[in-house]
Amino acid sequence: MKKKILFVASEFASGMIPFAATAINALAKDDRFEVHCLCVNSGIYSYRNIILQEANPVFLEYPKSKMMKLFYKLWPLEIIKHLSQLEKSINPDAVHFLTGDFTLALYICLNNKRTFYYTVHDLHPHEVVRKTLLGYLMQKYIIWGYKLCRNIIPNLTTSSYFQLKELKEIYPCKKVKYTSFPSLITSLIINGKKMPLEVSGLKEYILFFGTVDKYKGVDLLVDAYCNLTCKSLKLVIAGRGFDIETHNENIIRINRFIEDEEVAYLFKKAKFIVYPYRSATMSGVLSLAYYFNKKVLASTIPFFEDNACLLYTSPSPRDGATS
């Protein structure tokens, strides 16, 4: 008898989509499981092209109006309706919330079951810059939702050994398991041949790739690069996020969503990759560098230290990044 697994992926950040899709597809190809999944798309951030049909996907669309987006974050009625229907029709042996899924915190609180599983991504919140009061309050609500989910759900998983130890100490009565971090490599990345126009004509460069947030230390990287006496390679910062005042013609800022089809070109042309994170529990960007066989300069945070083949530097002083 096959085990029936229902995966839920209600969040669609660029790194979250391949994380969830890889896990879903892996079990969908395993004869021991009957897999179903409920995934939420938002425009270009979509699961549609990477989830296998064997996973029996149900796709929902994130609302477009500001008012409906707010309602979605508080009580995502469409997700709850479809989730309830799937639970009744499938009668799954496990329901696994893969992507943080803070919008479902109240639903989980009211309907918690021993068959629920929850992937913990960041036990400790990242340092994030919010420019408005609404943004600040929403960030607090998101953090509260994550905490409520992991406090209530009886089965937790993580892809960080450092976090695994801490979770077991905090929740001694819960089942806490380690799962390997899924690769972010998708077929669109593997077969992609699209060249980002911003790097047209460049033969080699130093690359930072990923969403630009404060905790990722991109400002430290920029300062360190500007302090170099020899700038034989340009610095490319590729990924949507807060903008950085550089006033340096050798720094190329690609502040937009990077399509999967563009990733291969960016990595293949890079001399090496830099990840100067101040903090992070887990990060899938390493799988991209490994796949394209690129050297990585990374800060000494626990998740990076769990992985071999890295050159480490201090995550805080600018001198460390410069060296």
Predicted regions: what they are:
Residues 10-14, 26, 30-73, 103, ...:
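N-terminal strand-loop element at the rim of the active site
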Residues 312-321:
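Conserved small/polar residues in nucleotide/adenosyl-binding loops
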Residues 84, 136-156:
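Membrane-proximal helix-turn-helix segments that form the acceptor-binding/catalytic region
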Residues 265-282, 291-294:
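Acidic donor-binding loop of glycosyltransferase active sites
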Residues 244-264:
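Nucleotide-activated donor-binding/catalytic signature segment of Leloir-type glycosyltransferases, i.e.
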Residues 45, 79-80, 95-113, 118-120, ...:
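An aromatic- and histidine-rich active-site surface loop
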